[in-house]
Amino acid sequence: MLKLVCAVVLIATVNAKGSSPGFGIGQLPGITVVSGGVSGGSLSGGVSGGSLSGGIYGGYPRLYGGFGPGGVYGSINSFGGVNTNAYGLYGTSPAVRGAAQGAAATSVLGILSGVPSRISGYSVGTGGGRAFVSGSATPIGGLPYGGYGYGGYGYGGYGGYGYGGYGYPDIAYYGGSTYGNIASGVISSPTSGVSLPYGGILGLYGGYGGYGSGYGGYGMGSAYSIGNYLSGHGGYYGGSYPSYGSTLTGVSQSLSFGRAIMSGQAFGAGVPAFGSVNFGNFGVGTGGIGILGGGGVIGSGGVIGGGGVIGGGGVVGGGAVIGGGGVIGGGVPTGGIIRKKKY
């Protein structure tokens, strides 16, 4: 049986203050997500004055082209890892590039929750072209924000980006919302005075084996997780010339009441990425959207359920430690090694 691996390409472009001819409509650049396709498949056309073309082969995206002054792209699957890349955000600090990626990744988490959500997060430069990124997506309706809390990290302890030689901490924030499959918000940095609006439509398309097409994440076959397989670039664009790109790697986690959080480390400012990181099996399921049920924390592929810690293929259940084919059950100790004494 084929396992579902649903790869998604994510583009989130940003325009600096004001609008530029050919760079979108007003100040709102585009965000586009494309996934699915067993082999072949391509998307070409204009989104806010830009174009995307290329094919998706075996679920792994190939991306060419770009939008306006810069963009963010990545992949999404069921393994619970985060990997997005930014390029073309010239003149921005690692924290700003990390925030752009965090906003895009967290917006996807909000879209996948299936309800309108608030997006919130921050990015802090840690020196050497790196930044720590954290954020959350929370359904609108009076629930408190999920996430890690600003106070716990102590901005003063991080190395600054060194604007003007003074070593001010490199900090950037992002905030916005999602509605249906539309995302919008603003990225801002008090250190550099940058304000970057973002927004657009996220289109989510189906996966393998009859999972079909989905709108807003339903029937998509992947839960709250940003993927980890992305070929190419690694902090460089066009091969040998640095474009001040960056790569974000990390993990995402679903919480109760439809909330989700993500955190990771962004590498940027022309510093090559240190390879892709697979944060596999982070307790995020492989299907469905809910917390209880297939693909949630409890359910098929989740922490408890078929393929999870407890259930078929897990620690307790068929094919695992306890259950058919496992240590205890229709496998080795019971019905395998132990025999009835014949008289």
Swiss-Prot record:
This is Shematrin-like protein 3. Keywords: Secreted, Signal. Its main location: secreted. It comes from Pinctada maxima (Silver-lipped pearl oyster). It is found in: Secreted. The keyword Phosphoprotein does not apply. Prismatic layer of shell (at protein level). GO terms for cellular component: extracellular region. Residues 1-16 form the signal peptide. It comes from the Eukaryota.
